[in-house]
């Protein structure tokens, strides 16, 4: 007895996209397979084998920033900052690093590279760029994007971005990234030839999918809430830190007044003059030390800002999943509609009010030949729709599996980096307090000798 063929509509219902296994299961093996695949693939598929670089083989640094003047696309003169990228090979017999490539890049070219990576690797939490303009500044910190201190911090941030990409098991194999480090001329044209702008999802389409998707995956909803919470917590932390920096700066600089008072006082005292002069010197040292302290604090603030911007990278992965889920639901809805039309034509009954029913009443029934032709056309469309739905579902499952693997990698990296940064910040604060105690101890000794 012949078994009835399963109903494709039943098989490919627009349920939330599911991974092939639990996100936590087999994570290490998946990452290992991807890394192994990078070694096994040939140069014809856009990966790097001859020129494959990892942090063990090539050192990447943004060693210098330079202020330049040129003309933009509107033929107007502008001032911008260019950054020198150097790559050094460390695979020589003597163990010495040798400069292989050096070129200059603008911040806008870093942005172009990241936009390309976002389009071609939507399942990856792409590392963020440092801020283009200073945020969460305290009153002594310049918000000018041409300020030398800000440019230096951005140089460090851009170097960190390149190291993040180079250490990623998938992004490091990208040909465009390799050319970014080695090809100064015509790099922009090479990127634009990939046509990545045409493949980018529009903001309107993404917003539409967010509100119209019927069966969102709960895990991605939780991930979106997690990214919002991460951004909120770090934002509050940076704001509090900026306020504390303002107050701390004021407290330290007040000690400069003490130093001046003690120095002037020493000029009119004969017996206590030396002690007052020494105490004033200690106060001046204490007051001037805050500049270096807050400069070190900015380094830790920049590490927090990196993960503030990582929150948007997480949301980009969520938006892509919502788009894929929405496309899947629309494909299933279209398939169901075509099946209903085919059934109505075959039985001659119309279940609901439709334009077809109105035209039939107005102009009469179709001939058997016309009906047969329409049924045949619909059956072909249904067959194509079933294949398309199956393809979208498999594509979605693959996206979820790869996305969760990278999200778990990101969370592990985030926990390690933030823990290290906060511990280092606490150690720095302890050191600062010890120096303060030492200054006041020295001042006390000066007073006791009077």
Swiss-Prot record:
| One GO process term, biological-process aspect | endocytic recycling
> Which PROSITE patterns does the entry mention?
PX
Keyword Protein transport attributed: yes
Which SMART domains does the entry mention?
A: PX
Where N-acetylmethionine occurs along the chain?
A: 1
Q: Which GO terms describe its molecular function?
A: phosphatidylinositol binding; phosphatidylinositol-3-phosphate binding
- Which residue ranges are recorded for the region named Disordered? 1-53
What CDD domains does the entry give?
BAR_SNX4, PX_SNX4
- Entry's localization field: Early endosome; Early endosome membrane
**Gene Ontology cellular component?**
cytoplasmic dynein complex; early endosome; early endosome membrane; plasma membrane; SNARE complex
* Every PX domain range: 61-187
Membrane topology, as annotated, equals:
Peripheral membrane protein
Superkingdom to which the source organism belongs: Eukaryota
Function of the molecule: Involved in the regulation of endocytosis and in several stages of intracellular trafficking. Plays a role in recycling endocytosed transferrin receptor and prevent its degradation. Involved in autophagosome assembly by regulating trafficking and recycling of phospholipid scramblase ATG9A.
User: Tell me, how does this one assemble?
Assistant: Heterodimer; heterodimerizes with SNX7 or SNX30. Interacts with WWC1/KIBRA. Identified in a complex with WWC1/KIBRA and dynein components DYNLL1 and DYNC1I2. Interacts with BIN1.
- Any notes on this protein's domains? The PX domain binds phosphatidylinositol 3-phosphate which is necessary for peripheral membrane localization.
- The identity of this protein, by name, is Sorting nexin-4
Native source species: Bos taurus
What is the primary gene name for this protein?
A: SNX4
């Amino acid at each position: 007895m012949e078994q009835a063929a399963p109903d494709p509509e039943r098989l490919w219902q627009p349920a939330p996209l599911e991974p092939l296994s639990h996100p936590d299961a087999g994570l290490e093996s998946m990452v290992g397979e991807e890394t192994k695949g990078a070694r096994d693939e040939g140069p014809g598929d856009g990966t790097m084998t001859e020129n494959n670089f990892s942090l063990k083989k090539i050192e990447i640094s943004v060693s210098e920033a330079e202020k330049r003047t040129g003309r933009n696309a509107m033929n107007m003169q502008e001032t911008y900052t260019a950054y020198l990228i150097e790559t050094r090979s460390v695979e020589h017999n003597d163990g010495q690093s040798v400069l292989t490539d050096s070129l200059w890049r603008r911040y806008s070219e870093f942005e172009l590279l990241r936009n390309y990576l976002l389009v071609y690797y939507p399942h990856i939490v792409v590392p963020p760029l440092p801020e283009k303009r200073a945020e969460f500044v305290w009153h002594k910190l310049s918000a000018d994007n041409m300020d030398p201190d800000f440019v230096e911090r951005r140089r460090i941030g851009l170097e960190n971005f390149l190291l993040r990409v180079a250490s990623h098991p998938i992004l490091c194999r990208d040909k465009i990234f390799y050319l970014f480090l080695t090809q100064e001329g015509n790099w922009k044209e090479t990127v634009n030839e990939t046509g990545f702008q045409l493949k980018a999802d529009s903001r309107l389409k993404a917003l539409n999918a967010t509100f119209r998707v019927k069966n969102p995956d709960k895990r991605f909803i939780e991930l979106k809430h997690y990214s919002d919470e991460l951004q909120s917590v770090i934002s509050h932390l940076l704001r509090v830190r900026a306020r504390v920096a303002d107050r701390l700066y004021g407290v330290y600089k007040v000690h400069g007044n003490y130093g001046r008072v003690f120095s002037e006082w020493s000029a009119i005292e004969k017996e206590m003059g030396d002690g007052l002069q020494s105490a004033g010197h200690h106060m001046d040292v204490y007051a001037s030390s805050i500049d270096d302290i807050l400069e070190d604090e900015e380094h830790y603030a920049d590490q927090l800002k990196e993960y503030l911007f990582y929150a948007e990278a997480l949301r980009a992965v969520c938006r892509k999943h919502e788009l894929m889920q929405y496309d899947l639901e629309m494909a299933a809805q279209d398939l169901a509609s075509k099946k209903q039309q085919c059934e109505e034509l075959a039985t001659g009954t119309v279940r609901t009010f439709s334009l077809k029913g109105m035209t039939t009443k107005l102009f009469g029934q179709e001939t058997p030949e016309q009906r047969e032709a329409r049924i045949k056309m619909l059956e072909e469309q249904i067959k194509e729709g079933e294949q398309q739905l199956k393809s979208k579902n498999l594509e979605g499952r693959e996206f979820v599996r790869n996305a969760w693997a990278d999200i778990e990698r990101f969370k592990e990296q985030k926990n390690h980096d933030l823990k290290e940064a906060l511990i280092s910040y606490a150690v720095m604060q302890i050191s600062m307090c010890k120096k303060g105690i030492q200054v006041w101890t020295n001042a006390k000794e000066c007073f006791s000798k009077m």
